[in-house]
Amino acid sequence: MKVQASVKKICGSCKVVRRKGRVHVICTAEPRHKQRQG
């Protein structure tokens, strides 16, 4: 999981979700696209 100041979708399968006040990107097609803001 990458931790970045700015998270954005990398591919069409990426989804932006909020968990516990943080913004996450989850991706079913490519697990390397997982990101968290912070």
From Swiss-Prot:
Keyword annotations of the record = Ribonucleoprotein, Ribosomal protein
Q: Name one GO biological process term.
A: translation
Pfam families assigned = Ribosomal_L36 (PF00444)
Provide the Gene Ontology terms for cellular component.
cytoplasm; ribonucleoprotein complex; ribosome
Q: Is Ribonucleoprotein among this UniProt entry's keywords? A: yes
Specify the domain of life of the species encoding this protein: Bacteria
GO terms, molecular function: structural constituent of ribosome
* Family, as annotated: Belongs to the bacterial ribosomal protein bL36 family.
Q: Which NCBIfam families match?
A: rpmJ_bact
Q: What is this protein called?
A: Large ribosomal subunit protein bL36
Give the originating organism. Answer: Psychrobacter arcticus (strain DSM 17307 / VKM B-2377 / 273-4)
Q: What lineage is this protein's organism placed in? A: Bacteria, Pseudomonadati, Pseudomonadota, Gammaproteobacteria, Moraxellales
